[in-house]
């Protein structure tokens, strides 16, 4: 794979699609800043003291306009940053160009191959001979996974001289990961150990990545402290819910121009993401059906006036299918073959394994017709009818549209800044062990408060007597940790 790192006139490394888009990216970044009060407040509060001075931060998170504002907040606080995207389709090329020119090393472009994607991840981790980053901002856990798999392979190599075998897995993406690690062992058999020893901690953005972290914690294999940003209330109850409520119909309409009203739409999963998607489809006039494994979530859906059925009950009747589960094997080839002609199938979970893309791609005689980028019609030979797959089964709101709007991402990314500051400021205190942590309630409330003025909201103030009556401080936090919002 003949990819070469390029350099700006100032010597900053990068690899993006088109640097001539940098001015366009800068204009949109300036618009987004006005819609991201939490990040701008973080610059005002922490910028003068430069708390990240000397810190090297690697980020693996969708390289969008909103992420550009996050990156420039980290650099405004003193950090050096190297960045890649966490999805092959989610990069906004003008955003990548603007950041590469002005602020940080970026390795990302829309439409990467899987090999290019992991090359970009490697580059974002490559801080030269001194080791890896001090801090990681992760989305989905791929960067964290690469370090952990690298350390595991180096330990096996040290004991037995055995290289990892890419042919030991059927997973095409994991084959690439093992190939990267194998090649790295030939030049530096301690590369990932050096990274592991340097990393102070990681802050993880998504449900999928958080699951990976908790699994590693349970197995005793987590190599450094982690902060679970996803489960901050001001992330999961806003980004996951209201963000998806905005960006799902945006992606559907940009990709297909379909009229949602009157259609039958199936939402697989009724967590925060599923709730946002179901609300958007219902408000657009669709008849929404939910599939669920959890009786509590299923009951919530019925209380919202939604039908709860199995996929098998409705697969031949629905017009739109949306997976939101974070699990695998939700819509399989047999389901797709039973769907209506031109049924729309898409995913707004994290990875591409909620929809059986491998089964579809390898089905004998199936024909793929690309309508436009990230919108494909797959025609089955048995019936000569087809289905429309968006973003190749990956995140359709970022592949077919521009993802969540700036304001709601300001909530999520302000949590990221606070998490990174917390890890960095406590790096020598021993406060954080090799475990997964959630930010405390008072910081969650602070993030929310930073976004109220922009919306014209005014908070009521408790009196001392009122605060004493409900046993909370006058200035908060106002809810116990176990409170369900």
From Swiss-Prot:
- What is written in the cofactor note of this entry? Binds 1 NAD(+) per subunit.
Q: Which GO-annotated molecular functions does the record name?
A: adenosylhomocysteinase activity
Q: Which positions bind substrate?
A: 64, 139, 205, 235, 239
Chemical reaction(s) catalysed: S-adenosyl-L-homocysteine + H2O = L-homocysteine + adenosine
Cofactor annotation: NAD(+)
EC number, as in UniProt: 3.13.2.1
Annotated GO biological process: one-carbon metabolic process; S-adenosylmethionine cycle
Q: Name one Pfam family in it.
A: AdoHcyase
Q: Gene Ontology cellular component?
A: cytosol
Q: Does the keyword Isomerase apply?
A: no
User: What residues does NAD(+) bind to?
Assistant: 206-208, 240, 269-274, 292, 327, 348-350, 397
Part of which pathway? Amino-acid biosynthesis; L-homocysteine biosynthesis; L-homocysteine from S-adenosyl-L-homocysteine: step 1/1
The record, for HAMAP family, names: AdoHcyase (MF_00563)
Family per similarity comment: Belongs to the adenosylhomocysteinase family.
Give the matching NCBIfam families. ahcY, PRK05476.2-3
What is the name of this protein?
Adenosylhomocysteinase
What is the organism of origin for this protein?
Answer: Lupinus luteus
Gene encoding the protein: SAHH
